[in-house]
Amino acid sequence: MTAQIIDGNLLSQQLRKDVAVRAAALTAKGKQPGLAVILVGADPASQVYVRNKVKACEDNGLYSLLEKYDADMTEAALLARIAALNADPKIHGILVQMPLPKHIDSNKVIEAISPRKDVDGYSVLSAGELLTGLPGFRPCTPYGCMKLIESTGTKLAGKHAVVIGRSNTVGKPMALLLLQANATVTICHSGTADLAYHTRQADVVVAATGRRNTLTAEMIKPGAIVIDVGINRDDNGKLCGDVDFANAKEVASYITPVPGGVGPMTITMLLVNTIEAAERETN
């Protein structure tokens, strides 16, 4: 068996067509969806991510506002900018690119963003809405992972899903989204005694540890769906995920590549959340 590759670029393009249609409809009513992106400092990876987010907005009919600040920007100044954007009717979503310089409290910054504009879905309120099943903004990466799984046509109800990783941005919300879809969910992490014992029982595995070869072929149940959230570098400096892709694809039924799997979906779901924020504001 060789797995079918879940093409995140292709699915992303399909979803962005819908984003563009919805953006055009809002713009026709005089309510063009707007996303503000704030970058503090000059982290090279962050600069690439921010550039991609702004371009995605422009390509799909959203207004984008990019604000770049030096790494010595004070926390108070950043909070003041967020307060101003909270009050700006042209802005429906606010994203502060992480990581922030060490002197700025990222939790305080996230909580300063209006809940109506928290399109990253990182705030305590957004987390609570997800936990209790209330409508709200889902964190973009897990939201994209769910769309990738849905694209296979697999019904998650009754399936056993294993999430490797327990971060607030991916692992925990991923588990909650799978739970909402009626999967039976196991969360594994650095304290899990026998990771392979759990993954070998899983119909779906989501790997989100940030470590190469966290999931190898012998740890995968034949026919499982494998979603690889990791972004790492191999010994040659080439991009790779958390999964040993070359061997895992011979065991899984569906698998996401790195790059070209989860990555493009994260930005797409940011656009979807921004559109939803604008639609709520308009309605």
UniProtKB/Swiss-Prot annotation:
Its source organism is: Janthinobacterium sp. (strain Marseille)
Q: According to the UniProt entry, what is the EC number of this protein?
A: 1.5.1.5, 3.5.4.9
Quote the protein name from its UniProt record. Answer: Bifunctional protein FolD
Q: What does this protein do?
A: Catalyzes the oxidation of 5,10-methylenetetrahydrofolate to 5,10-methenyltetrahydrofolate and then the hydrolysis of 5,10-methenyltetrahydrofolate to 10-formyltetrahydrofolate.
Q: Which keywords does UniProt give here?
A: Amino-acid biosynthesis, Histidine biosynthesis, Hydrolase, Methionine biosynthesis, Multifunctional enzyme, NADP, One-carbon metabolism, Oxidoreductase, Purine biosynthesis
* GO function terms (MF aspect): methenyltetrahydrofolate cyclohydrolase activity; methylenetetrahydrofolate dehydrogenase (NADP+) activity
Binding of NADP(+): at which residues? G165, R166, S167, S190, I231
Which first-to-last residue range defines the signal peptide? none
Q: Which family does it belong to?
A: Belongs to the tetrahydrofolate dehydrogenase/cyclohydrolase family.
Biological process terms from the Gene Ontology for this record are:
L-histidine biosynthetic process; methionine biosynthetic process; purine nucleotide biosynthetic process; tetrahydrofolate interconversion
Q: How does it assemble?
A: Homodimer.
Entry-linked InterPro entries: Aminoacid_DH-like_N_sf (IPR046346), NAD(P)-bd_dom_sf (IPR036291), THF_DH/CycHdrlase (IPR000672), THF_DH/CycHdrlase_cat_dom (IPR020630), THF_DH/CycHdrlase_CS (IPR020867), THF_DH/CycHdrlase_NAD-bd_dom (IPR020631)
Recorded hits in NCBIfam families, A to Z, give: PRK10792.1 (NF008058), PRK14186.1 (NF010783), PRK14189.1 (NF010786)
Give the UniProt entry's GO cellular component terms: cytosol
Organism domain of life:
Bacteria
Reaction catalysed by this enzyme: (6R)-5,10-methylene-5,6,7,8-tetrahydrofolate + NADP(+) = (6R)-5,10-methenyltetrahydrofolate + NADPH; (6R)-5,10-methenyltetrahydrofolate + H2O = (6R)-10-formyltetrahydrofolate + H(+)
Which PROSITE patterns does this one have? THF_DHG_CYH_2
What pathway does this protein act in? One-carbon metabolism; tetrahydrofolate interconversion
**PANTHER family associated with the record:** C-1-TETRAHYDROFOLATE SYNTHASE, CYTOPLASMIC (PTHR48099:SF5), C-1-TETRAHYDROFOLATE SYNTHASE, CYTOPLASMIC-RELATED (PTHR48099)
